[in-house]
């Protein structure tokens, strides 16, 4: 079985930049990602990453980016599978726009949707140079979500988060809605406050601890979206939520570090443990309430 998404409204905020090629060397993008980042190059302590434990799952949060690079645009021809994936992304993004617009309206606020930029290999954006190895991420500087669609194949091949294309659909929706969760944090003013605290932190342990809370809140917001979308569309099939939980488990810091280096360094966590990611996603999914996602003041994560 697979989630039913045919009646989701398609967003017009998907920008296909896969034909864009970028010159120059690599420069780490400073964005908020779901947890498959492999950073190449020098990373300062202020970014909250311990270079000795760089793993898929590391996180960068900083202002500014690399200088703009010259780009060229070439047409991209899609096969049927790629075209369907693009349609799915537009559908999920469209529904996040609708659900968060409703929730913001109920709070007396206006929701300003982000753009989602599709790319292949590498792209230059508001947070610097992005490469596909970084995984999906949100850039606070230009308020765009960046996604290389090859990441969805990685969910199957590298992380074992799901077994096939159909089984992966809700896991993929979780990935997208997590990144939108970061944009929601930006809209609510949470990100600027946390970034200021990170910049004032005296060491990387404090920076990472704040980052974990930000990432877990985005997981919770992904759950809130799923709850509201289910109420609206009744789109979930048996096993869909399990797939999202399996994905959250597959990209927990503890599991990634254990697989990469054979041991776990809790002080270096930037996204939370597998159990924490599952717990906070379910907090949002079971309640459907933003108030259930206060990871910043929670005494226990």
What do these predicted ranges mean?
Residues 8-21, 25, 29, 33-270, ...:
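A Zn2+-metalloprotease active-site environment signal
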């Amino acid at each position: 079985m697979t989630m039913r998404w045919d009646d989701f409204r398609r967003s017009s905020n998907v920008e296909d930049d896969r034909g864009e090629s970028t010159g120059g060397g690599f420069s780490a993008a400073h964005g908020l990602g779901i947890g498959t980042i492999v950073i190449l190059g020098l990373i300062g302590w202020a970014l909250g990453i311990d270079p000795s434990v760089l793993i898929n799952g590391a996180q960068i949060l900083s202002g500014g980016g690399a200088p703009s690079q010259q780009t060229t645009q070439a047409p991209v021809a899609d096969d049927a599978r790629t075209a369907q994936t693009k349609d799915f992304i537009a559908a999920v993004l469209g529904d996040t726009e609708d659900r968060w617009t409703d929730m913001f309206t109920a709070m007396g606020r206006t929701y300003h949707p982000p753009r989602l930029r599709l790319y292949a290999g590498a792209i230059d954006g508001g947070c610097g140079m992005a490469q596909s190895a970084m995984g999906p991420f949100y850039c606070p500087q230009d308020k765009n979500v960046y996604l290389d669609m090859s990441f969805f194949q990685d969910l199957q091949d590298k992380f074992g988060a799901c077994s096939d294309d159909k089984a992966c659909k809700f896991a993929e929706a979780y990935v997208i809605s997590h990144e939108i969760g970061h944009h929601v944090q930006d809209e609510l003013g949470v990100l600027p406050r946390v970034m200021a605290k990170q910049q004032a932190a005296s060491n990387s342990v404090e920076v990472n601890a704040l980052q974990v809370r930000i990432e877990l809140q985005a997981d919770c917001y992904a759950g809130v979206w799923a709850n509201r979308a289910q109420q609206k569309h009744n789109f979930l099939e048996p096993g869909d939520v399990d797939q999202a939980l399996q994905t959250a488990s597959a990209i927990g810091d503890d599991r990634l570090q254990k697989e990469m280096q054979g041991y776990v360094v809790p002080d270096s966590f930037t996204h939370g443990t597998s159990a924490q990611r599952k717990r906070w996603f379910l907090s949002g999914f079971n309640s459907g309430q933003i108030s259930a996602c206060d990871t910043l003041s929670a005494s226990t994560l």
